[in-house]
Amino acid sequence: MYLSILAVGIGGALGSLFRWFLGLRLNALFPALPLGTLASNVIAGYIIGAAVAYFGRNPQIAPEWRLFIITGLMGGLSTFSTFSAEVVQHLQQGRLNWAAGEIAIHVTASVIATVLGITTVAVVTR
């Protein structure tokens, strides 16, 4: 149990730090659509897709690795709450089209990235 707690905790800390770094580097480039938040979610979507596919093909791998990568690292990297706050900010400012566009971009890009992650593992492990 302690190893699982460590896996999630360390993964979560590392993922959160990477998300923070992306925000620092990218959000100022285009404040109307914070690119750090978008990059965090898309990268996490890709890696989660690849990880789910990889762990599904390799059930012998210790479950702590799954907890570290999927629950911890990608849980810390992806940021639905920040995305939601950004959308609500657009809504409060009366920018309905921006809010709808941000929703469409985040959801579409993240789902496509997840499918690409799954596809990558399928192609590489043939």
From Swiss-Prot:
Places the protein is found:
Cell inner membrane
Q: What reaction does this enzyme carry out catalytically?
A: fluoride(in) = fluoride(out)
Annotated membrane-spanning segments are 3-23, 35-55, 68-88, 103-123
GO molecular function annotations of the record:
fluoride channel activity; metal ion binding
Q: Which Gene Ontology terms describe the biological processes this protein takes part in?
A: cellular detoxification of fluoride
Matching entries from Pfam families are given as: CRCB (PF02537)
Please tell me whether the keyword Transcription is annotated for this protein: no
Membrane topology annotation: Multi-pass membrane protein
Q: Which UniProt keywords apply?
A: Cell inner membrane, Cell membrane, Ion channel, Ion transport, Membrane, Metal-binding, Sodium, Transmembrane, Transmembrane helix, Transport
How is the enzymatic or functional activity of this protein modulated? Na(+) is not transported, but it plays an essential structural role and its presence is essential for fluoride channel function.
Report the HAMAP family cross-referenced here: FluC
Could you tell me which NCBIfam families the record lists for this protein? crcB, PRK14196.1
* Annotated protein name in UniProt: Fluoride-specific ion channel FluC
Q: What is the scientific name of the source organism? A: Paraburkholderia phymatum (strain DSM 17167 / CIP 108236 / LMG 21445 / STM815)
